[in-house]
Amino acid sequence: MTGMRXPHPLIKIINHSFIDLPAPSNISAWWNFGSLLGVCLALQIITGLFLAMHYTADTTTAFSSVTHICRDVNYGWLIRYAHANGASMFFIFLYFHIGRGIYYGSYSFTETWNIGIILLFAVMATAFMGYVLPWGQMSFWGATVITNLLSAIPYIGPSLVEWIWGGFSVDKATLTRFFAFHFILPFIITALVTIHLLFLHETGSNNPSGLNPNSDKIPFHPYYTIKDILGLLLMLLVLLSLTLFSPDLLGDPDNYTPANPLNTPPHIKPEWYFLFAYAILRSIPNKLGGVLALVFSILILTLFPTLHTSKQRSMTFRPLSQCLLWLLVANLIILTWIGGQPVESPFISIGQLASISYFSIILILMPTTSLMENKLLKW
């Protein structure tokens, strides 16, 4: 195998990426999420492909085709719920992966980081369009509310919304195009992942210490392949437990009611992984302001390399910054909770406070704390 690994043009690329790749000797389990995201993407493409074989992207039959998949197709229920819960796992790993990047200062690899943010937007768009496809109440009203936000764009807004809808409301044309985009986007994501890895391999991996690891590297295989397989097995355990024991735990019961344009659900909300951004959107009374805050809540990630004021890369030896990061995590959990609550007191004011603190922690508190830590270390 070694004889073939080095000279073969295709296997050589795989060899340099996954076998003989020099990796830092001290990377922790927080570095497992990249490979887990790759597995999730593959799983989503495979299950999605089988679902697409039986799904019909038509308003009259979409809901019943999903029911047909669950009832009549061999293991259709398993494929459907593995796909739905696989998306939840995907986002859990994405948020862990981003959190790890922030904690250990991995954002200083700016090219890799920026491609990662583009990937996040692409995955979010894919998940949103996928949520529309079962054509339940929450699918329909979620699509209506979120696409309608674009009407806040000055001058071109209303025309843009109608152009996306393919008519004057969310209807057959909208569903068909959402299915087309939902099908093609994962392949675009796969291409972006390749670029993400390409940029990463230009610099090599970061490590928990934040120091240059070139003096102490080990081959990726067998050390990290075994470690990744352990992560994979744990992921499958969680995913299968979720899929087989409580497949609807993270879903919305309203989506088991067929879409009805004449009946608005009492509380329209997206899937749990978008609730933090949805809470930020709702906490601003102005429509355009809300949309800008929503977009900026994700785009703010691009500012991390610029806002890094510390003389150290990682937060490993910076307890004050660590406290702030965990405060940010707690804040995001509060935002997620608020996003799922009705728009009434006290949830409105809690959401507004959490939104203000989200932006102020990132834009003001983290950079100033880093400067203070530099002073404390007499740097």
Curated annotation (Swiss-Prot):
Amino acids binding heme b b562: 83, 182
Residues annotated to bind heme b b566: 97, 196
Entry GO CC: mitochondrial inner membrane; respiratory chain complex III
Sequence positions that bind a ubiquinone: 201
A GO MF term: metal ion binding
SUPFAM superfamilies: a domain/subunit of cytochrome bc1 complex (Ubiquinol-cytochrome c reductase), Transmembrane di-heme cytochromes
Cofactor(s) named in the record: heme b
Signal sequence, start to end: none
Cofactor note text: Binds 2 heme b groups non-covalently.
Membrane topology term: Multi-pass membrane protein
UniProt record, GO biological process: mitochondrial electron transport, ubiquinol to cytochrome c
Transmembrane segments: 33-53, 77-98, 113-133, 178-198, 226-246, 288-308, 320-340, 347-367
Keywords: Electron transport, Heme, Iron, Membrane, Metal-binding, Mitochondrion, Mitochondrion inner membrane, Respiratory chain, Transmembrane, Transmembrane helix, Transport, Ubiquinone
Subcellular location: Mitochondrion inner membrane
InterPro entries (alphabetical): Cyt_b/b6_C, Cyt_b/b6_C_sf, Cyt_b/b6_N, Cytb/b6-like_sf, Cytochrome_b, Cytochrome_b_C_euk/bac, Cytochrome_b_N_euk/bac, Di-haem_cyt_TM
Family affiliation: Belongs to the cytochrome b family.
Function comment: Component of the ubiquinol-cytochrome c reductase complex (complex III or cytochrome b-c1 complex) that is part of the mitochondrial respiratory chain. The b-c1 complex mediates electron transfer from ubiquinol to cytochrome c. Contributes to the generation of a proton gradient across the mitochondrial membrane that is then used for ATP synthesis.
Note: Heme 1 (or BL or b562) is low-potential and absorbs at about 562 nm, and heme 2 (or BH or b566) is high-potential and absorbs at about 566 nm.
Subunit structure: The cytochrome bc1 complex contains 11 subunits: 3 respiratory subunits (MT-CYB, CYC1 and UQCRFS1), 2 core proteins (UQCRC1 and UQCRC2) and 6 low-molecular weight proteins (UQCRH/QCR6, UQCRB/QCR7, UQCRQ/QCR8, UQCR10/QCR9, UQCR11/QCR10 and a cleavage product of UQCRFS1). This cytochrome bc1 complex then forms a dimer.
UniProt name for this protein: Cytochrome b
Protein encoded by which gene: MT-CYB
